[in-house]
């Protein structure tokens, strides 16, 4: 921390030997859908991962890392969306898919698997809407979008926000690159509009 600090090269080497074992584990993605009433080849995916970090260093004796905002709220959101879509008298034209992938916290492995083994044609996905880390600050009128400006869906969102008296809040931490670090990104890499 001193402004006078200057690194020096020690010209030394270190040899490390390590023995490691691992167990192969399986963890499922969870998916449900409501069939579309029209072009049932096309789908809209609502996405929210179900995993969290699990356990870590204890805080006040509790080592459980609770995942209420990341990402249990997204699961509640998807269940409510499914209930609302199912209650509609006139069903949407497209299939409405609810995908809750596993292992987002370890590199969105569940989503990567899904885009390589889709249950609905990957080239017929019209949009992917991802909810990750939902703030629980009470009612507000803003819609904060991670990576706003990077999605083909931005204009559609802007129209809807205006229609419902909401305003769009661009990603306040865009420098963190969160657009590239959540479950919608494997879909983006396949050319699918996602946010």
Where are the regions that the model predicts?
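Beta-strand segments within the central parallel beta-sheet cores of soluble alpha/beta enzyme folds
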Residues: 44-47, 93-102, 127-130
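C-terminal soluble interaction/assembly domains
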Residues: 77, 81-82, 86-91, 108, ...
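Second-shell loop/turn segments in exported
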Residues: 17-21, 59-71, 140-148, 171-177
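Active-site alpha-helical elements of protease catalytic centers
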Residues: 67-81
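A fold-wide structural signal in alpha/beta-hydrolase
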Residues: 78, 95-97, 193
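Metal-dependent peptidase/peptidase-like ectodomains
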Residues: 1, 39, 101-195
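Soluble metallo-hydrolase cores and metallopeptidase-like ectodomains found primarily
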Residues: 1-67, 83-90
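Phosphate/oxyanion-binding active-site loops and adjacent basic polyanion-contact surfaces
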Residues: 24-25, 73-75, 107
């Amino acid at each position: 921390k001193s402004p006078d600090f200057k690194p020096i090269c020690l010209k030394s080497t270190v040899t490390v030997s390590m023995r490691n074992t691992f167990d192969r584990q399986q963890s499922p993605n969870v998916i449900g859908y409501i069939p579309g009433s029209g072009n049932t080849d096309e789908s809209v995916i609502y996405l929210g991962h179900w995993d969290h970090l699990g356990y870590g260093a204890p805080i006040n004796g509790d080592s459980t890392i609770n995942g209420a905002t990341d990402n249990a709220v997204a699961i509640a959101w998807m269940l409510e969306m499914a209930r609302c879509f199912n209650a509609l008298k006139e069903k949407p034209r497209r299939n409405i898919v609810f995908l809750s992938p596993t292992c987002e916290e370890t590199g969105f492995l569940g989503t990567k698997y899904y885009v390589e083994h889709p249950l609905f044609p990957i080239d017929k996905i019209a949009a992917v809407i991802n909810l990750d880390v939902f703030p629980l600050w009470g009612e507000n009128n803003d819609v904060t979008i991670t990576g706003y400006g990077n999605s083909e869906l931005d204009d559609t969102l802007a129209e809807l926000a205006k229609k419902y008296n909401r305003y769009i809040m661009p990603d306040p931490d865009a420098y963190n690159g969160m657009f590239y670090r959540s479950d919608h990104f494997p879909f983006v890499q396949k050319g699918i509009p996602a946010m």
